[in-house]
Amino acid sequence: MKSYKQLSKKERAALYAELMESYNEYVKKGLLLDLSRGKPNGSQLDISNGLLSVDLTKSYSSRAGVDCRNYGLLDGLPEMKEFFANALNLDKNDIIVGGNSSLQLMYDTLSRALLFGVHGSVKPWAQDKGLKWICVAPGYDRHFKMTELFGFELLTVRMLPTGPDMDEVERLVRDPKVKGMWCVPKYSNPTGCTYSDETVRRLAAMECAAPDFRIMWDNAYAVHDFSEDKDELADIFTLAEEYGNKDRIFYFSSTSKVTYPGGGVAFMAASANNRKQITPYLGAQTIGYDKVNQLRHLRFFGTPENMYKHMLDLGKVIKVKFDIALSKLDELSGLDIAEWTDPKGGYFISVDVMKGTAKRVYDLTSGAGVTLTPVGATFPYGIDPDDSNLRLAPTYPSDVELALACEILVLAIKLAALEKLGI
C-alpha cells in the first residue's frame, strides 16, 4: 500500500472504517497481553536452572579457603572479580562485587555522592544547589526516576544511532552544575543502539566544568547478543585513562538477565581513587554481600567462555521473539507512519510513530487488552515532547501472545495515524 499521506481523505475514511471493524473484533476477545517490561519468561529462565542444582555442600569455601557462608570480603570473592574482569575486559582490581542488583549499586553510589561527595569533590553534592544531570532519551525510565528523586534537574539529550548527541553533551558539561550523565552503552534501553567508538572516545575525553563529573556507565547488556553477529563496544576505561579521566567512570553490570533477575550477581568498577573514597562508606553499610551466590555462579559457569555459550543459547531464544515482533512491524513498511529499531541484542525494540499519536496508540492498544510501557516513560519526567516513542519488550509473552499483541499494536498505529491525518 502507498503512504498514508498520499491517500485522499475519502480513501483514509474507508480504510479507517475497515481497520476499526477489525479492532473492535479484538476488543470483544477480552485479551490480557503484556509488552511493557523487559523480563525473561519461564522458558528463558529454565536455561539457567542448572544454577539451582550446583552442589555447594561438599565445598563452600573460596579458592583461598574463605568460608562463603560467613561474614567477610567486603568487595567480593577475588575469583568473582577475575571472572567479571576476564569476561568484560576490566581490571580485576577495579571491581567491587555487590548483591543481586546493579540498580541498587547505582542508587547507593548517588546517595554517597550526595552525602559525602566523590573523589575530587569540594563538598558533598547535597550542599550544592541547582544540580543537573544529563539523561539520554529515549532511555531507561528507572535511571531517570532515580536522579529525579534525588533532586537533580534532568537535561534531555537525544539518542542518535551512534549514541548520545555528543555536540549537545559537550555543550552541557561546560556548566559546573552538571554533575553526571546516564549511559547504557550497549544495546541501549530502549533503542538497542550501541555507542560508536567515536562517541565513547568523546565521552572519555571531553572537558567538564565540574571536577567531580561522573558517567554512570550501566553496561547492563554487555553479553546479551543474539548471535555471533554482534555489536562491539569500545573500552571506556582504556580511553578514559588515555585522557587522564579514569575517575570519571562508574561502571555497573550484573548477571540479572544472564541467569536470574532476582538472584544474580552485580558489580561496579571504578578507579583506585574512587574505590579508596567509596570503601569506608561501603564498610559502614554492609559487612559483605552474598558470597554463596557468587560461588554458585562461579561453579555454574566455570569460565567466561561458558557464559558466552550460555548467552548465545539464550540469545537464540530471544531472537525468535524479536523476529516475531519485527515481522509484524514490517506491515507498516512504506506507509510513512512509523519507524523502528532492529537491534542485534538486548531486550527492547523502540518504535517511533507519527508525532502526536503515541498516547492514542497506547489508549487503543490498552482498549484491546495489550499493555505497553506508558508513553513518556522513556523520557525524563515521563514527558515525550513529540508524543511519538513506544518501547516494546518482546521477551516475556509466549510466541502466540506476542504475535497477537503486535498485530493489535500495528492496527492501533494505523488507526492513530489515520486519525492524525484526518478522516
Residue ranges with predicted function:
Residues 2-75, 79-86, 367-370:
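N-terminal "arm"/small-domain region of PLP-dependent enzymes with the aminotransferase-like
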Residues 350-355, 372-414:
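Conserved PLP-binding active-site segment of the aspartate aminotransferase-like
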Residues 60, 66-211, 222-244, 358, ...:
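Conserved core of the PLP fold type I
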Residues 312-326, 337-352, 366:
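Conserved glycine-rich beta-strand-loop-beta hairpin in the small C-terminal domain of fold type I
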Residues 98, 238-319, 330, 418:
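Conserved core segment of the aminotransferase class I/II
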Residues 219:
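Walker B catalytic acidic pair
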Residues 361-367, 406-410:
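Short amphipathic alpha-helices in soluble, non-transmembrane regions
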